[in-house]
Design a protein with these regions (language model features):
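Residue-level marker for the onset of beta-strands and adjacent loop->beta junctions
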Residues: 3, 33-35, 74, 110-112
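N-terminal beta-strand motif that seeds the catalytic metal site of vicinal oxygen chelate
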Residues: 1-17, 73-78, 129-135
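Hydrophobic pocket/interface hotspot
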Residues: 15, 19, 86, 93
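Short secondary-structure boundary/capping segments
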Residues: 37-38, 64-68, 106
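Short, flexible, mixed-charge acidic loops at enzyme active sites
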Residues: 52-67
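Vicinal oxygen chelate
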Residues: 90-135
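Mid-chain, well-packed structural core segment of small domains
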Residues: 70-91, 97-98
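Core segments of cupin and vicinal oxygen chelate
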Residues: 6-55
Length: 135
């Protein structure tokens, strides 16, 4: 099984560039369309749907209004290889237009994790399966 996770976005190109710069993932060029961009690995595709996708998916009545903040009802957790890679990525988030909601911390289940927000307000986490030395 391969997971494809999509975000509904106002600016698909900017969102793709944010995550591409943050994670260093290649674009899934074969999936590119006027209303879709994606990043892809052998294990997953991370997609960005334009606003037109709400109607296409019969979700127009659930499309957030521009003046309202979208509630957090789900979030992706992207697993990185090392605590150092996580710290480096988190340090880039503000310069890329995102927000650090919770700086890297040791979870009670032994992961090194940060809670972040992309430029359009989607919440996501970066995590690793190990803790940095001394944490």
């Amino acid at each position: 099984m391969k997971l494809w996770f999509n975000l509904l976005c106002r600016d698909i190109e900017a969102q793709m560039r944010f995550y591409q710069a943050l994670l260093g993932l290649p674009e899934a060029e074969a999936s590119r369309s006027p209303i879709y961009r994606a990043l892809e690995t052998a294990d997953f595709q991370f997609g960005f749907n334009a606003q037109a996708a709400y109607a296409l998916l019969n979700l127009a009545d659930r499309q957030p209004q521009d003046s309202t903040e979208t509630p957090v009802v789900a979030y992706a957790t992207l697993m990185l290889d090392t605590p150092e890679a996580l710290d480096k990525a988190v340090a880039q988030v503000p310069a890329l237009g995102g927000t650090v909601l919770k700086a890297p911390y040791a979870t009670y289940y032994g992961q090194w994790q940060a809670v972040l927000c992309d430029p359009e307000g989607h919440v996501f986490r970066l995590s690793t399966l190990s803790l940095p030395g001394g944490a």
